[in-house]
A protein has these predicted regions:
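Gram-negative/organellar outer-membrane beta-barrel architecture
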Residues: 2-170
């Protein structure tokens, strides 16, 4: 093995905690089988990583509206992230977004995320007197593939995103 380094052990403990899968992470040092050796025992307490959200409302303009979202940042215990969001109600409001992230796709800790979406937002333009002069919908439909890798500084990442998106204005 390697010589024990308390600073490296604390950093490893912090990296495990930063994964966001555990409520608590503790390191215990036990005497090793060889003289001047230690065995490191790491104990963790898992946390709930799933999310669920729901919302509803009513307006004169749109009638009943709602939202449902489901996600998990440790999907099936693999560290993968999955999120689904669906909004409904009103004339054109049937928005959805789906994303799936694989945290490590190679030995250099590159992550990959695929996102699919179909979103419509309503906008209004106003003149200098704050009078509405135009109203329009912007529909975004597309897919994205994002690759991410940490730099030498573990708190900084580089991203590369490939997008195929249609923006439609009505």
């Amino acid at each position: 093995g390697e010589p024990f380094n308390a600073k490296d052990a604390r950093r490893s403990m912090q990296r495990i905690y930063n994964l966001g899968y555990f409520e608590d992470v503790n390191i215990k040092l036990n005497p090793g089988q060889q003289p001047n050796a230690v065995e490191i025992e790491i104990s963790v307490v898992e946390m709930n990583t799933g999310t669920f959200g729901i919302g509803a409302g009513y307006s004169d303009a749109d009638g009943f509206i709602g939202m449902v979202s489901v996600g998990d940042k440790n999907f099936r215990g693999t560290g993968d992230k999955v999120n689904i969001r669906w909004e409904f109600g009103g004339a054109d409001n049937k928005n959805y977004e789906f994303s799936y992230t694989k945290p490590w796709i190679d030995s250099k800790e590159t992550s990959a995320t695929i996102t699919l979406y179909d979103v419509t937002n309503e906008y209004a333009d106003y003149d200098r007197n704050a009078d509405e002069i135009a109203r329009y919908d912007k529909k975004r439909r597309g897919q994205e593939l994002t690759f991410s890798r940490k730099t030498n500084n573990e708190y900084v990442s580089n991203y590369l995103t490939l997008k195929n998106r249609d923006d439609i204005y009505k």
